[in-house]
Amino acid sequence: MNTNSKEVLSLGVQVPEAWEELLTMKVEAKSHLQWQESRLKRSNPLAREIFRRHFRQLCYQETPGPREALTRLQELCYQWLRPHVSTKEQILDLLVLEQFLSILPKELQGWVREHCPESGEEAVILLEDLERELDEPQHEMVAHRHRQEVLCKEMVPLAEQTPLTLQSQPKEPQLTCDSAQKCHSIGETDEVTKTEDRELVLRKDCPKIVEPHGKMFNEQTWEVSQQDPSHGEVGEHKDRIERQWGNLLGEGQHKCDECGKSFTQSSGLIRHQRIHTGERPYECNECGKAFSRSSGLFNHRGIHNIQKRYHCKECGKVFSQSAGLIQHQRIHKGEKPYQCSQCSKSYSRRSFLIEHQRSHTGERPHQCIECGKSFNRHCNLIRHQKIHTVAELV
């Protein structure tokens, strides 16, 4: 045997080992890549939203034929709902969430989808926070307007009963020393504050007022005269009225640069801006989920409180529903109430019995989307899908 034959023979012996090593490296690399991809999909709700859109928007004309269209829909639905890692309740919640978003107005649909809620409860919390953001300025505006209307109603009847302007009485000043003393005596009664308050508001509307000695003075002179200690209560009430009117006139001074919405208080603007920035400073200590408002965190904590109601006394495991606790306790007690009518085998859970009965009926509900092969157990399908993964690498 010549040298070339020996080299070929030696290569023939070494090639399978090198090929096996290369194949192992490829399988490990792809497994790591799939693990990273699945981790990204689990941690990123936006990925599930993309799969949902593809699932809903797939056109028959985009596929080569009916089988390919059905297979593609199965793949997208599988990636969207993730039945291998999601419970029935979670899948049901996703379907309800989709229908809930579809009945919302289009403007709210887009806004809620941008925040990528993972459940219907999260979508409701987002909408409730948004409603509170929108209602706060309107509520304050209504309160100010109500105070303004009450103030005007008190001013109008008093102005009709006691005219004090020069036009109504140009030549005969009515405010004498006797009348001033009378007013002073009235001021000692329980109604003094209310009467003086109305006179003060009325005088603000009058350009000039008659003084006891017939001297005319304007609003500035009146304000100086109110500095007298005997009129302290009137001046204090006047300041309070001016502050209320100042708040009304200054309404909307805090404006959002993004959408132009105005708020009376800076705290309202700060809460509103979190909608645009996506900031969520309130974080749950249990699961790490964050919220833009404290009310959202408060409502979310109720979920954890509900989830921790049912404790197993044997091992300390926690369940959100009593049925889950009852099923779990059968493990400790050894109870197997579900019995197969074919072979009399017993199981602690009904799902185990259903899975066992497929061995008698021949039912295979778990189908591979790659080749169409069916299996009676989901674990067998997962084991089978590894064959396709290795084939793709080769």
Swiss-Prot record:
<feature type="zinc finger region" description="C2H2-type 2">
    <location>
        <begin position="282"/>
        <end position="304"/>
    </location>
</feature>
<feature type="domain" description="SCAN box">
    <location>
        <begin position="52"/>
        <end position="134"/>
    </location>
</feature>
<feature type="cross-link" description="Glycyl lysine isopeptide (Lys-Gly) (interchain with G-Cter in SUMO2)">
    <location>
        <position position="238"/>
    </location>
</feature>
<feature type="zinc finger region" description="C2H2-type 5">
    <location>
        <begin position="366"/>
        <end position="388"/>
    </location>
</feature>
<dbReference type="GO" id="GO:0000981">
    <property type="term" value="F:DNA-binding transcription factor activity, RNA polymerase II-specific"/>
</dbReference>
<comment type="function">
    <text>May be involved in transcriptional regulation.</text>
</comment>
<feature type="zinc finger region" description="C2H2-type 3">
    <location>
        <begin position="310"/>
        <end position="332"/>
    </location>
</feature>
<feature type="zinc finger region" description="C2H2-type 4">
    <location>
        <begin position="338"/>
        <end position="360"/>
    </location>
</feature>
<dbReference type="GO" id="GO:0006357">
    <property type="term" value="P:regulation of transcription by RNA polymerase II"/>
</dbReference>
<dbReference type="InterPro" id="IPR003309">
    <property type="entry name" value="SCAN_dom"/>
</dbReference>
<feature type="cross-link" description="Glycyl lysine isopeptide (Lys-Gly) (interchain with G-Cter in SUMO2)">
    <location>
        <position position="215"/>
    </location>
</feature>
<keyword id="KW-1017">Isopeptide bond</keyword>
<dbReference type="Pfam" id="PF00096">
    <property type="entry name" value="zf-C2H2"/>
</dbReference>
<keyword id="KW-0479">Metal-binding</keyword>
<keyword id="KW-0863">Zinc-finger</keyword>
<comment type="similarity">
    <text>Belongs to the krueppel C2H2-type zinc-finger protein family.</text>
</comment>
<keyword id="KW-0677">Repeat</keyword>
<dbReference type="GO" id="GO:0005634">
    <property type="term" value="C:nucleus"/>
</dbReference>
<dbReference type="Pfam" id="PF02023">
    <property type="entry name" value="SCAN"/>
</dbReference>
<dbReference type="GO" id="GO:1990837">
    <property type="term" value="F:sequence-specific double-stranded DNA binding"/>
</dbReference>
<dbReference type="InterPro" id="IPR013087">
    <property type="entry name" value="Znf_C2H2_type"/>
</dbReference>
<dbReference type="GO" id="GO:0000978">
    <property type="term" value="F:RNA polymerase II cis-regulatory region sequence-specific DNA binding"/>
</dbReference>
<dbReference type="InterPro" id="IPR038269">
    <property type="entry name" value="SCAN_sf"/>
</dbReference>
<keyword id="KW-0804">Transcription</keyword>
<dbReference type="InterPro" id="IPR036236">
    <property type="entry name" value="Znf_C2H2_sf"/>
</dbReference>
<feature type="cross-link" description="Glycyl lysine isopeptide (Lys-Gly) (interchain with G-Cter in SUMO2)">
    <location>
        <position position="26"/>
    </location>
</feature>
<keyword id="KW-0539">Nucleus</keyword>
<keyword id="KW-0862">Zinc</keyword>
<dbReference type="GO" id="GO:0008270">
    <property type="term" value="F:zinc ion binding"/>
</dbReference>
<feature type="zinc finger region" description="C2H2-type 1">
    <location>
        <begin position="254"/>
        <end position="276"/>
    </location>
</feature>
<keyword id="KW-0832">Ubl conjugation</keyword>
<protein>
    <recommendedName>
        <fullName>Zinc finger and SCAN domain-containing protein 9</fullName>
    </recommendedName>
</protein>
<keyword id="KW-0805">Transcription regulation</keyword>
<keyword id="KW-0238">DNA-binding</keyword>
